[in-house]
Regions:
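Long, charged/polar, surface-exposed segments that mediate recognition or autoinhibition
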Residues: 96-212
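Surface-exposed flexible segments
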Residues: 45-61, 139-153, 251-255
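Short amphipathic alpha-helical segments that mediate assembly, nucleic-acid/protein binding
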Residues: 33, 62, 66, 70, ...
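Short, low-complexity, Pro/Ser/Thr/Gly-rich segments in the mature regions of secreted, periplasmic
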Residues: 238-255
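Low-complexity, intrinsically disordered Gly/Pro/Thr-rich segments
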Residues: 213, 217-237
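Small side chains
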Residues: 12-14, 36, 197
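Short helix/turn-capping signatures at newly exposed starts of structured segments
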Residues: 23-129
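Classical Sec-dependent N-terminal signal peptides that target proteins to the secretory pathway
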Residues: 1-25
Length: 255
């Protein structure tokens, strides 16, 4: 299992994104959300040479010095602490698709501190989270400009209100056997039902203060009939004020 995870991480974390899209540079103004679902598209464009080496994006360079540097970095990269969540009591447990966390070497020139990948088992979907140490507003502007999108902004309190109303609406819809109340709540707070940035720690739930979300309908491929939602979210790390988190992926629209 360790060898398999290491190979996946060093070659390209975006492989865990299944059928989304191969990571491409951000030079094209027509870049779509589907082409950028792995988040690494933005990361590779503005990132240090070291991360490009780790992600296997510089294998086309044949200079012996570069190859040597790449091997050295990949060794260092693979030695970083990697957490594999292996909880067989979880109803969504899947031995062949663990969640992984990679801590990148600390480097002032590289704002990305760690990358997490997660595959949802109970519902179809995957996501990538990138933990950044730079300014959240700068990240927001970069993504909006490069993808030609506009984030919807929410506060932590709005998300709490949404959850309370959503839970109540779910109960009412279960009683009625129809999706009426939940749709009304979603229309009031569009995008928020894909957000999962809360952190449970020390018996307490921590909610981000700033939340930016963009979402749109998504089809993974023509053979998959269910409706899906593709999303990008950007929010402050509620348990570490020096970081913000860029998350993107897709999930079944089963709510």
């Amino acid at each position: 299992m360790t060898c398999m995870i290491q190979k996946i991480l060093v070659t390209s974390i975006s492989l865990l994104m299944i059928h989304t899209a191969t990571a491409q540079p951000i030079s094209a103004s027509s870049l779509t959300l589907e082409q950028g679902l792995s988040c690494l598209d933005w990361a590779e464009k503005e990132l240090s040479f070291s991360n490009q080496l780790a992600l296997g994006e510089r294998t086309d360079i044949s200079t012996p010095a570069i190859i040597k540097l790449q091997k050295q970095f990949q060794q260092q990269y693979s030695k970083q602490k990697t957490t594999i969540i292996d909880d067989s009591d979880d109803e969504g447990f899947c031995e062949d698709c663990p969640e992984t966390t990679v801590y990148l070497p600390r480097n002032k020139s590289n704002p990305i501190q760690r990358i997490e990948t997660s595959m949802h088992v109970s519902v179809a979907g995957v996501s990538t989270s990138i933990y950044r140490a730079d300014d959240i507003k700068t990240t927001q502007q970069k993504i909006e400009n490069r993808l030609n999108i506009k984030f919807s902004r929410y506060t932590g309190q709005q998300f709490k209100n949404f959850k309370q109303q959503w839970d109540k609406a779910l109960d009412q819809d279960k009683d009625n056997g129809k999706r009426i109340k939940t749709i009304q709540v979603f229309q009031k707070y569009p995008h928020l039902k894909v957000f999962n940035g809360e952190v449970f720690q020390n018996q307490k739930i921590y909610t981000p203060k700033q939340i930016y979300i963009y979402s749109q309908p998504y089809k993974r491929d023509t053979s998959y009939l269910n409706d899906m939602i593709a999303f990008i979210s950007l929010y402050d790390n509620p348990v570490n004020s020096s970081q913000h988190i860029l998350q993107c992926g897709f999930i079944d629209n089963v709510f």
